[in-house]
Amino acid sequence: MNAKNWPIVKVTLPADLKGIKPGEVPEFLLRDVKPHGKLHWLAADAYHAMRDKAFADGIKPFKPISEGDTYRSLAFQTTIFLQRYQKSPLAGASTRTWEGVKWYKKSPTLASLAAPGTSMHNLGIAVDIWSAYGPRFEWMLANALDFGFSWEVVPEEPWHLRYTAGDNIPAAVQAWLDRKKVV
């Protein structure tokens, strides 16, 4: 799929995240997601609604692979960043700037990573979906917007979705929430 066809929507933060430092989201704003990790409660509801729809449509598994694919504390983001980037220049390496210093990716085979405090994972509104290729990716492309998710970096990270709907619960998520109340 051509990257120009990928939906990239501007993020509207949930109101309860205003003033929260990235990577320091209070536990009461986070909710567990299956099978690993936590997301901001609005993003978690949207993720679970999307996951249930994916399952109903035969897209299995549909999940983050590890806790690092959801909310990341500042300490965790820093640890991963230091594993992937170094201060010593590397010819041809992609770079990130963190705290006014240029950092170089250690290997082109490593996935890129936002500098600590700048990732949507640090706010609990990003989720990385395992194996986002083929039918799974096509399903995501056709359905992610209905659940309030959009891409951020394409085509480098087809697995990386972020919740963009803020406090405006998408209709597909509200329908899922309503069905949960009836059951």
Pin down the residues of each PLM region.
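Cell-envelope/glycan interface and biosynthesis
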Residues: M1-V183
